[in-house]
Amino acid sequence: MYLVIAEKPSVSRAIAEVIGAQEREDGYLQGTDCMVSWCFGHLAEYVSPDAYDEKFNQWRYEDLPIIPKDWKVTVSEDKKDQFYILKRLLNSPEIEYVVNACDAGREGELIFKHVYDLSGSKKPVKRLWISSLEDSAILDGMQHLRSAEEYRHLAEAAVCRSQADWLVGMNATRAYTTKYFKKLTVGRVQTPTLAMLVERAGQISNFQKEKYFNVELDCDGIPAVKPKIFDPDEAEQLRSRCHGNEAIVTAVKETEKKVKAPKLYDLTTLQREANRIYGMTAKQTLDTAQSLYEKKLITYPRTDSQYLTEDMEQTARNVVRQIYEKYQLTGPFDQPEQPDVKKVMNNSKVTDHHAIIPTMELASSHLDELKSWEEKILFLIAVHTVMAMSKDHIYQETEIEVECQGEIFKAKGKIVLQDGWKLFENCFKNKDRMAIVDPDQEMKERMPKVTQGQTFYAVAAEKTEHFTSPPKPYSEDTLLAAMETAGNKEFDEDTEKKGLGTPATRAGIIEKLIYSQYATRKGKQILPTDDGKVLVEILPDFLKSASMTAEWENQLLLMEHGEIAPEQFMTGIKNMLTMMLNGCDAISEEETRRFQTRESIGTCPVCGSLVYESKTNFYCSNHDCHFALWKDNRYLQSMEKTMDKKMAAELLKNGSVHVKDLYSRKKNMYFEADLHMDTDETGKVNFSLSFPKKKPKTKANKKNRLEEETKNEF
């Protein structure tokens, strides 16, 4: 008997159907010689700092850095039932070995490792490594299970990535939050990404547009241009000299050019194209692609390869044929030309997973049953697959130079000789319909035939006004491209470059920036908020450096290959934390008030953000924190007292405050006591009292005392 553990229930069901585990049990599927169970994504995660020491429950700068000696993992509260099922199965005497069937990648290794380690199991582990959930792929994968030892370095990289993110996130966020009295979220990857948004926004806001002029000659219908003349008088003089005069062709250059078909999709290029064509966010595209994968309609989406392996040649031909049949391509596509599959095959360019293509399940699928986004993304992948294996786009480009009054004007035109893959690109221009645009409708920039020495008489000259343009704000498309190549110029040519994040994590990074209110979407644009701009301004360069973060990603890749040790990578992360705290020590008191726009009464004991007064309470300014001191809280109301500003400020400062004129209904007397406040990590507040050694007062005693004090004043 063996146990298969997948990442999600849907994947478990697909595997169970193939290996014959059809009997439903509580949290798993049972077969004659196997069991199939599942996680719910990250079933376990690293614990929060207070699990190592209760003092970390409160955010204090002097407690930093927080660096666990022995890392602890805990199960998410809402997933404990499934974990205990897995733990029981992993330690069952019936089970001889375990198959790790979590997603074939870095995160899949981490998900399985956490569960396996927490369970205490010592069962041998094998690895199912597949790029498709088709029955044939699962069956082949199960018949050729790999040793878990093959993926030891991948698991090490997964652990280091997760621990590095924890260390940077926890320490940097607490350091800058407690220094600036405002919740400031800092991340190993998200902060350099934010810095790119802020840099682009600065380039746009600081841009000074300049006016320039083009002078254009009409040479018997051929527009010949002298561009970018910044002096208006010079431009007008040139126009005036040329208008009505003759122009002579001094050079004609005809060049045949070929444009190769785009490569197959990896996740990043799919996300970029879906954003450009459909306006989908990176996360929407990833979620949709994952759904199509689980429905067995496309191959594994979280890939960084744009090639297929050489043993997939016949599969690729069959898939292309199936795409033609499924989408009933008409007109010039009645007979699919033999796809050039060789151009998309390269074993050296495929590591964990090959490029994203449809599966043969496309043949039996019902497209009308798919959700709108699923239908669009499947269509995008299908047509792009055909496009990538199509002929080159070939055109003839003609460049001419025309001399008029001693100045050279240039014109350019082209004639398409072979549409090739561009024919399929028209599908995307017609994105709302599953049809191919007639190529005859495509505009072709033709130029009349001209010869060197040809003269144009009485040409018309026109001056047109233009302005230089600022850089465009990032869209999800261009931001993903920038993240993918960030820091690459710092590396040698032979260095494997990974940029900021990975294809699987970039969508989440963008969403986190928006959730943290450091960035916002405006149509297709992604713009930094004012808080995002200030955060980037206050952080040291190394925390927002794209090249440093890209270097970390490269080191993780080297670790996957077994070329560097985990200790080497983690030492670098810890050294960076030390450097960060040294910089924080030097922050001036005046600088720490940068985010403060109104008077606060103190700092939150839970997260260190500023606390402000409202009509009903004193609340933490961090929207993720639930700490609040209510003016009419039940504890004080029971003693006929309300929380005022002075009391709240003292509690925030010292954790206790001496309170007079508290009333006990039971004993019908007033008394005074020290009010103590305790908080937990959720922001829940508990009050308690301690009593100074003073004589209690009744209501009558209080009245007499007040009268006596009044007399003494006079």
Segments predicted by a language model, with ranges:
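Metal- or metallocofactor-binding catalytic centers and their adjacent structured scaffolds
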Residues: 232-265, 271, 547
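Basic, low-complexity terminal or inter-domain segments flanking catalytic cores
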Residues: 2-3, 79, 90, 173, ...
